[in-house]
Amino acid sequence: MFEQSISTLAQKLRNKDISSVELTRLFLARIAKLDPQLNSFITVSEQHALEQAAAADVLLQSGKGTSLTGIPVAHKDLFCTEGTLTTCGSKMLHNFVPPYESTVTSRIQQAGAVMLGKTNMDEFAMGSSNENSFYGAVKNPWNLDMVPGGSSGGSAAAIAAGLAVAATGTDTGGSIRQPASFCGITGLKPTYGRVSRFGMIAYASSLDQGGPMAKSAEDCAHLMQAMAGFDEKDSTSADKPADDYLANLNSPLTGLKIGLPKEYFGEGLDSKVADVIMAAVKEFEKLGATVKEISLPNLQLSIPSYYVIAPSEASSNLSRFDGVRFGHRCDDPKDLLDMYTRSRAEGFGTEVQKRIMVGTYALSEGYYDAYYLKAQKIRRLIKEDFVKALEEVDVIMGPVAPTTAFGLGSKTSDPVAMYLEDIYTLSVNLAGIPAMSVPAGFADGMPVGLQVMGNYFAEAKLLNIAHQYQQHTDWHLQTPTMAKGA
């Protein structure tokens, strides 16, 4: 049951082959059995989930509901959920229960989905390995000694292990795509502004974007149907009608023009990962696509640009956590300054403190022009590279990450090695375009994701491309051994 698609489960719920309460209990039992090994959930909301499932059953009984009604999903723990702990993976918010619901979780709830709980993540979404969480590292279900990727590692691991049918994630520099690649699932980072950021705790406001994570492109499309669309509560929301993401999944790919950026296949890319990606591209050629080499000349500049812009925005966003209104407050402060200083020192982990310091430095007088302004100019060049390339081709393909999942603790002492894991994903966020990670095979027994990048608001096209690939391959149907034992 845990391996079945949203469409199949929705049909079973409609036919009364199973009730939402039974389905929810099945997933809660799997979480109880398997998650102690994975640590993919921070909060499991058992009672709330069963209440939602019972309400979904009543709705289905009357012949109403959507394709998500009664389907058990999980949410990354930076989406505010009214009445349910929302920690952002940080000690700073270890006791924060939001008084309101984020737009993303609200829309999925209105579609009738059941919330199993909140998934683990790198603290304030800062990390590429899910080792920066106050609640402990998440393990990769394919190999418990490996990282699941970050920062949405809990969501990716939970789906791969069959602890949730689908989940929400967020992507600031690859945080949906990289864990999706490492855990062998499908993930979509939408165009900036396509999915509301209201109630999504901010890391870097000009880069953050919520998106769906699931086993397949079709399941991601079901989630996008609920998530996408204009939201007046979010000033960065795109006032443009959302597409029907399910309507064109079966469109043929004949004549599709694929660009392969030479910069994505150079030094640093593991040769076994490259082989998997090229085999996937050949599959697209069989489906009627044509392939040409393109260039994104400023790719190498995406890391220095991103690691100035994102920490700068984070230092501003995270200044609100000072021990006054909400979040962690130190014991017995001597005065106001002592309370600010100690609350932040105690509440934030090392990586978050590091990025706040970098951002504050980059924005400080005398350095703003040298760092922040220059990084924004580079960002413009990167965006222009994509715009130019997407005039020649329909989509751009390449690897999501230079390697498969790496060992827990293997890169924590080398921040540059950790940051280089994001080399192929950061530029997409800087440009604001949509991109997906699609399971494409294995290297040394670990999953490899194919990255598919498209033009602004072309999510429906990306989902169509990924779905057609998944109709002719079965990489997305592979299940880790540990998941089969429950």
Curated annotation (Swiss-Prot):
It catalyses: L-glutamyl-tRNA(Gln) + L-glutamine + ATP + H2O = L-glutaminyl-tRNA(Gln) + L-glutamate + ADP + phosphate + H(+). The keyword Magnesium does not apply. Keywords: ATP-binding, Ligase, Nucleotide-binding, Protein biosynthesis. It is an enzyme of class 6 (ligase). Its EC number is 6.3.5.7. Coiled coil: none annotated. InterPro entries: Amidase, Amidase_CS, Amidase_dom, AS_sf, GatA. GO terms for molecular function: ATP binding; glutaminyl-tRNA synthase (glutamine-hydrolyzing) activity. This is Glutamyl-tRNA(Gln) amidotransferase subunit A.
